[in-house]
Amino acid sequence: MAVSKFTLHNAPTTGGSNEAAVVFPWNTPKKAVNPYLDPAEVAPESALSNLIALYAADNEQEQLRRETLSDEVWERYFFNESRDPVQREIEQDRLISHAKTAREQQRFNPDLVIIADVGAQPAHISKPLLERIKYFHSLGRAKAYSRYLRETIRPCLERLERVRDSQVSASFRFMASHDGLEGLLVLPEMNQDQVKRLSTLVAAHMSMCLDAACGDLFVSDDVKPEEIRQAWERVAAEAMRLEVIPPAFEQLRRKKRRRKPVPYELIPPSLARMLCADWWCRKLWQMRCEWREEQLRAVCLVNKKASPYVSYEAVIHKREQRRKSLEFFRSHELINEDGDTLDMEDVVNASNSNPAHRRNEMMACVKGLELIAEMRGDCAVFYTITCPSRFHATLNNGRPNPKWTSATVRQSSDYLVDTFAAFRKAMHKTGLRWYGVRVAEPHHDGTVHWHLLCFMRKKDRRSITALLRKFAIREDREELGTNTGPRFKSELINPRKGTPTSYIAKYISKNIDGRGLAKEISKETGRPLRDSAEHVSAWASLHRVQQFRFFGIPGRQAYRELRLLAGQAARVQGERKAGAPVLDNPRLDAVLAAADAGCFATYIMKQGGVLVPRKHHLVRTAYELNDEPSAYGDHGIRIYGIWSPIAEGKICTHAMKWKKVRKAVDVQEAAADQGACAPWTRGNNCPLAENLNQQEKDKSADGGTRTDITRMDDKELHDYLYSMSKKDRRELAARLRLVKPKRRKDYKQRITDHQHQQLVYELKSRGFDGSEKEVDLLLRGGSIPSGAGLRIFYRNQRLKEDDKWRNQY
């Protein structure tokens, strides 16, 4: 049978049949695919495939358009400083946190994440923390290193974030959202120049607020004082957003029940201050230093293990401030209308600004209280009051305190002041009275605590002590249990062990200049009390803490004015008989004589005695307004002299009006002092050393002789040096600079590797490089200048700081 459309092949038969197998298109054998030899088969285009491709292209274009629009909107509203820089920073912080989380998941090492978080902090936080981390890592103890990161560094970073949140409020962030004020958010990271520029912008913003307020309120030419006060209120509200109290705020603010009329004359000077860039610079710089110090407390950089009482940065700033003040005093003098001049440095050193004079006056006052207590038969009790644990940032071992609530040093001081005020009110209600002195000093982490030396009747001692203990431990009472010693201590002073003055002498000295405490070691910090006096002074200046306060006695300012009056009278009277009366009234003259003799006990009794209200004191300080207005247009108050309610008129003790002027400088001497840096003149501008060498050659040629000071004894050398002129002293100082001091190369202290690492770490923590050159210099008996005339030296495996370092050699 013939088949025309099919191809026949020989195929095996089935069931004995001879029929041939027919091959159809659907079962034709396929050819093997070789992608290297055969060309790629292209699918045939169809209407459906073309439609799908068009839809895909439209979707891609729409997605690109939406992304572009989203980026434009995001950049317009969030990445534009003129819109909302705060939101931009929040978004950046969120992205950074996401990146950190991703890295943490990838690395799976929490220690590296902690180190990365530390590195992301500002330099004043990250640098000292990284130095500590590096030191712990160099010890080679992996478990202790990891435990230090997790138990110390991580809580420190968490506390740092809480402190920052408490510092920057919502209103403060709102102020930072204005044009040019973004720097307020990073105020603790700024230096002094940056704060000056920021203060200029803040003053400009206040000026614009005042212009806007005047435009809204002053609708007519006849402006009323109340409308001016409302304009002041708007500017003051802007200042309050920055957590700065406006000047004269209490007198000018709105009150429901005002007893006195509104002092509208205080509005112009208040506005002048709020519109002044210099005034804002002082306020912002003070805020910057306080915020920065609280951040350093949060990361445990202020404690006895690192820097007691206050950070090293604050100590260095205080030294620099003192150095600038000394330079200012030395370059100025005081002159009066008659042409008489006084050296300003001598005047400052002779005043109560001198720490030695301030210490002597307080010790004399305490001695006077002691004599009065003996005369009255009163007993003396020594109290110590401490803040609750929520005010303490660091434990005694240097680790973070888990109970700390981000309370500042200033808040701890305010807590003690409020507690003392409440106790005094309750004591007066019960008819109990006392008098004495209190000393405010810091713990190792900067928290304030008080020491009180109080005199009272013996029958009232138990009642006063119980009442004071009640108020001292009433907050957070549950954390004390049965032991109230950590919060309150009282000790009845036993005359057999020591006098009340001897009890308080150490606390007065170590909070002023450390005089007489060179060998005393602090039980809290383990350091000499004399070395810690500088830290305490910087702490009190930074946090504005009043260190000393006398209560229950007449004021000491009247005592100073009486002594000044006695000195003036002695100069006027000349050779008048000693003991002659100065004042006509015998009662007032007795007070003046007691003050002139320096006997506080007699002075207090002649004034009326202890526990006497101020209105009954015989002599009080008189004040008056300044003749010349200040830079802000107001007349400040200054001391006039003394006055008494039993006598008419006032006695002036400041009759002379003194002006401070810059000292006149001799141009030739100034040029000679500057040497090669002197400006071009017609004289010789060679360096000073060359001039001196030439002068010595001329003297030798003329046959002149040079005095040999090496053969003089101490008295002859003293007389010779004090008889030299200023020019001869400068020449001698220049010759001494040319002579290189001899070094003892054979002397070197031997220390272990661990002590070497500790020395390097402590040098770096104080702001030095900690290089081998510095370490070798210290080990060979040398010293490194640290500012304000002090030097650092290494003795007995301890780094010390003193201006008498050669005495330790």
Curated annotation (Swiss-Prot):
Enzyme class: hydrolase
Active site: 503, 507
Keyword Transferase attributed: no
EC number(s) recorded for this UniProt protein: 3.1.-.-
The UniProt record lists the keyword Hydrolase: yes
Disulfide bridge map: none
Any one GO biological process: DNA replication
Keywords: DNA replication, Endonuclease, Hydrolase, Nuclease
A GO term, aspect molecular function: endonuclease activity
Described function: Possible endonuclease which induces a single-strand cut and initiates DNA replication.
Protein family according to the UniProt entry: Belongs to the phage GPA family.
Stated name of the protein: Probable replication endonuclease from prophage-like region
Species of origin: Salmonella typhimurium (strain LT2 / SGSC1412 / ATCC 700720)
